[in-house]
Amino acid sequence: MSFELTPIPVNDDILDAVASGSYYSPHSVLGAHLGDDGVTIRVVAHLADAVDIITPTGAYAATHERGGIWVAALPGKEITAYRVSITYGEDTIVRDDPYRYLPTLGEMDTYLISEGRHEDLWKVLGAHVKTYTDELGETTGTAFAVWAPNARAVRVVGEFNYWDGTQTSMRSLGSSGVWEIFVPEVGVGARYKFEIQGPGGNWFEKADPMARATEIPPATASVVTDYFHEWTDQEWMQARRERNVHDGPMSIYEVHAGSWRQGLGYRELADELVPYVKQMGFTHVEFMPLAEHPFGGSWGYQVTSYYAPSSRYGTPDDFRYLVDAFHREGIGVILDWVPAHFPKDEFALARFDGTPLYEDPDPLRGEHPDWGTYVFNFGRREVRNFLVANALYWLEDFHIDGLRVDAVASMLYLDYSRKDGQWRPNQYGGRENLEAIEFIQEANATAYRRHPGIIMIAEESTAWPGVTAPTSGGGLGYGMKWNMGWMNDTLRYLSEDPVNRRWHHGELTFSLVYAFSENYVLPLSHDEVVHGKGSLISKMPGDKWQRLAGLRSLYAYQWSHPGKQLLFMGQEIGQEQEWNESYSLDWWLLDQEGHAGVAALVERLNKIYASSPAMWDDDYTGFEWIDASDGDHNLISYLRKGSDDAGNREVVVCISNFAGNPHEGYRVGLPFGGEWVEILNTDSEEFGGSGVVNVGTIIAEDTPWNGRPVSASLRVPPLGAVWLVPASQVR
């Protein structure tokens, strides 16, 4: 006795929705489903002439049911592995079926995503290559998952389906807002996007917010990638976990990867930039944002793919190679991170599922008036999760040693760059963005918990209290903060003609009033050499010699001032032109003696700094004024103090003359008697100076001065700095 098996019936309207790729649960219709009298298998095969289902026990012909959907009823009481044979005219292909696979996200994953607490978000969302094995062999493909809670339907499209998303519509994983599908035979290098049907029924294409690789701009597709790099920095990473970054030197070289030298990718930078930074003595390099951005003129500060290193310079593994190369040379890597805002490009995060999803829906909070960008909705837990996990991603997957967080002030204040009537107070009537504060605290606390030894740095331009105070005490939890006040005051002072500086002496000394209220970085960054501001050397008054001397005195002052220091690329060679991201630095300047001298000075400053705890000990006990009040001579002098690993106390006497004339026999009070030696003089001929130096041993005299028991008479060069140490301290 025989009888014909009947497929499990499905409503025609649902079949039509599935066929068009607009059904929220295609896996409930397509794929294999066990019924009372057998197994029903439905597949999508538009324009096919014939479809067969191949199982371990044989092949079964499918019949065309409706709108490109084919169905077969198989005998049996359990679902087995199968493949699909599809005939188009004279051609037949055999492929695996995306709709026979279970979700690649577990219930715990979707729960944590819904709660905004999935710290490893990049491991479950985005595109991930996976391999499965069954009775018919091995299948490798890519699992796609995207968060789009307000979408009516989502499809993944790419070269693998001829950009026809009706063959690969994704399933909704319930209230999590996640859509998911595993697509067999899609591997590394495949380009893809998501087609999203918004609440209004319109379709639009979006790049993957969690993409870990992208096409080279201006192309905008996401790219499937995987992780193949084998790290060689185990010694560095172990030491990082055990050290406190505050208890050591930190001299940062800020770099724009595309214009340090034009045409270099990540691997070429490993060959050229790494040895250069090593030679110059910087302890860290800080890259301007490398997350993918469509417009090069944004310098990376308008990010569209937060999880993808810019493909302009190579692959994600190429970037890992670069970081690895820095670590092998003992150099830390800091990355600029931009969680404050994102651009309105239609292919990216903006109105991602047809609604304000990543951006704040309130127009008085959701747009940045100065930059024409959207502001993240820090009050939405899934958005906070996206950003917190992003910070962890760079720290974990790329071994980044720190993140410099851009535009923190714009997050903290609801009225930032807004006039009256353009902002709405918080629940207490204040201008503080309480949700942003919570996000910042969460991001910092989580980063330090997951990755001991890293550093989170705030670019925060206001007097917000407790930026570097721990979150446990109500602080924002950053490890360091850019000292914008020091930078502004110092550059304003040095832009004055030396004749007039006596009237601006307070601008030079004011920073020491608050120097120990936070953990500071002293930044001479890219922001000071763009938008018509000129280069650092162009800010100095006088002729070429005076401008070079002024630049050298600035650097000596910066390196000896409490705080860590940061210098933007090109300024170490006295770059004369304002920075332009479209051109390489003017390396030919090193053929000129004066510019080569500036570079030699920066190299010497870093060498002295790294070997002298007195210069990087940022405790308030490590600084003492000798004379802060000699404004008539444009002179300041102070002590830096610290202890080496053996507990030996070190001192460095720092004298800076910002006047255009030298001082012969200038008396300076010293902390104790004995022999002293000059370890740095920015007017030395080797740095391009005029040679007003102190040769040989300097003997402290029993002449009280500056409130000190002894003193010495010195030669102090014009527009120059002198550093002295006890002769016994020279090693």
Regions found by a protein language model. Give the residues of each.
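Carbohydrate-binding surface patches
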Residues: 28-33, 37-49, 140-143, 150-152, ...
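Conserved, mostly hydrophobic/aromatic
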Residues: 43, 146, 194, 255, ...
